[in-house]
């Protein structure tokens, strides 16, 4: 039996109104993330990736379409349901440390606060705090304030806070955006370890291609839609096999590098072969 996906987006549309002008940030985006996957969602500024993360985190609602995370239909959440969703179903790691950690609490107290809100107290809480700090490799820093830690260690602490209540899904928004290369690799390695050993589904939203090279599956988003996917057999090796995504309306976006290399623009010719589709420039002569 196939496991139910942890993240499902079906034809998501998000329209904003700014000064009487409508901006369509998402244009029928479709995405599926299976349990235990670690996926990077990559896109340029304005591609819609941050809008998507806002919806998946339950902080925003789509104008149309459906988003389901950890079996929770985000479009049907009540206020109580949204609170339960944030406490138990998902964890968040944001780029800005101020959104991850309370500055006047120690790292251990930050983790403990999440557990206290969820009703976990006493020895169970203390044990979970020790467990999760050790899991992310900062067990010796629990008594320190966030300001006493480097940016990389602060992000590891943020991962610990996000994992405190054993969520099914971890959402990360540019988690390495403010870090140097060494610290960024340590944060990504920790996320991989959490993904592999805890079975937590991880979705990383980023514009950084080097982040994409550290995960097995990369989904690119462009113009508010998923455009291509890359699957890697070996992390850190050469680029993996490239996939194009066909949405439910039958639309397909070719990788931009393919378009540039072959001079594809405006219209292209399609020919159905035995086991593939041949794509040629629209100005090529038709082979008879």
Where are these regions (language model features)?
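Conserved ABC ATPase signature
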Residues: 145-149, 153
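Conserved ABC ATPase "signature" region
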Residues: 72-73, 112, 116, 123-141
């Amino acid at each position: 039996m196939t496991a139910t996906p942890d993240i499902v987006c079906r034809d998501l549309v998000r329209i904003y109104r700014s000064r009487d002008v409508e901006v369509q940030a998402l244009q029928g985006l479709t995405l599926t993330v299976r349990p235990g996957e670690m996926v990077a969602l990559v896109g340029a500024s304005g591609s819609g990736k941050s809008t998507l993360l806002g919806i998946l985190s339950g902080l925003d609602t789509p104008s149309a379409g459906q988003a389901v995370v950890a079996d929770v239909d985000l479009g049907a959440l009540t206020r109580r349901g949204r609170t339960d969703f944030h406490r138990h179903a998902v964890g968040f790691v944001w780029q800005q440390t101020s959104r991850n950690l309370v500055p006047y609490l120690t790292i251990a107290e930050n983790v403990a606060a999440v557990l206290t809100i969820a009703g976990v107290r006493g020895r169970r809480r203390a044990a979970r705090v020790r467990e999760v700090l050790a899991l992310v490799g900062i067990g010796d820093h629990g008594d320190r304030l966030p300001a006493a830690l480097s940016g990389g260690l602060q992000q590891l602490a943020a991962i610990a806070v996000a994992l405190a209540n054993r969520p099914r899904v971890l959402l990360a928004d540019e988690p390495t955006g403010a870090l140097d290369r060494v610290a960024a690799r340590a944060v990504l390695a920790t996320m991989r370890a959490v993904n592999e050993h805890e079975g937590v589904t991880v979705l990383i939203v980023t514009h950084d291609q080097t982040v994409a090279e550290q995960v097995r599956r990369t989904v690119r988003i462009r113009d508010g839609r998923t455009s291509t996917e890359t699957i890697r057999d070996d992390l850190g090796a050469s680029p993996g096999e490239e996939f194009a995504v066909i949405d439910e309306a039958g639309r397909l976006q070719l990788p931009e590098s393919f378009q540039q290399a072959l001079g594809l623009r405006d219209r292209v010719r399609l020919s159905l072969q035995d086991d593939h589709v041949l794509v040629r420039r629209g100005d090529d002569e038709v082979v008879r």
